[in-house]
Amino acid sequence: GLNDFQKQKIKFTFDFFLDMNHDGSIQDNDFEDMMTRYKEVNKGSLSDADYKSMQASLEDEWRDLKGRADINKDDVVSWEEYLAMWEKTIATCKSVADLPAWCQNRIPFLFKGMDVSGDGIVDLEEFQNYCKNFQLQCADVPAVYNVITDGGKVTFDLNRYKELYYRLLTSPAADAGNTLMGQKP
């Protein structure tokens, strides 16, 4: 099973990335709220085509998540169902490619939420805005960004984000994946 630290990180993903209305469950309206929040953060920089593509992706994501986690088939994914899904998933997950499809599809969407300039790289200012816009409790943003970039040796691009997201979800101990929660390891 998962240790308490892993459960805490999984709870963060549930609360922060999915349960947008904070009612303790994931439902269709949470995905609608995600689109609204995403548009607010990106200040209208989404084209209509991007918006439609993202909306279709979120609809697919919700179907896949429900199919994997909604044990009682009530069109609601509770925290307990979400945790049970992750306990099964993490037991066999060895890389990003082993993550559920809905989770893999979410990664570029989340990355775009940080990379508001659209240049494929999240710089310090964009990361600071991400922490502020999403109300992450980050005491020292530059220090956290330094961990993300390994002291400037690694570019904070989509591949780095994938690696950090995978580590956030699967690592049994504090490591660089915590930076996506605005925390140093």
Curated annotation (Swiss-Prot):
Chain sites annotated for binding Ca(2+) 2: D70, N72, D74, E81
Keywords: Calcium, Metal-binding, Muscle protein, Repeat
InterPro entries named among the record's database cross-references: EF-hand-dom_pair (IPR011992), EF_Hand_1_Ca_BS (IPR018247), EF_hand_dom (IPR002048)
Binding annotation for Ca(2+) 3: D115, S117, D119, E126
PROSITE patterns per UniProt: EF_HAND_1 (PS00018), EF_HAND_2 (PS50222)
Boundaries of every EF-hand domain copy: 5-41, 57-92, 102-137, 138-173
A GO MF label: calcium ion binding
Binding site for Ca(2+) 1: D19, N21, D23, S25, D30
More about this protein: The sarcoplasmic calcium-binding proteins are abundant in the muscle of arthropods, mollusks, annelids, and protochordates. This protein has three functional calcium-binding sites; potential site 4 has lost affinity for calcium.
Function per UniProt: Like parvalbumins, SCPs seem to be more abundant in fast contracting muscles, but no functional relationship can be established from this distribution.
Protein name, UniProt field: Sarcoplasmic calcium-binding proteins II, V, VI, and VII
Native species: Branchiostoma lanceolatum (Common lancelet)
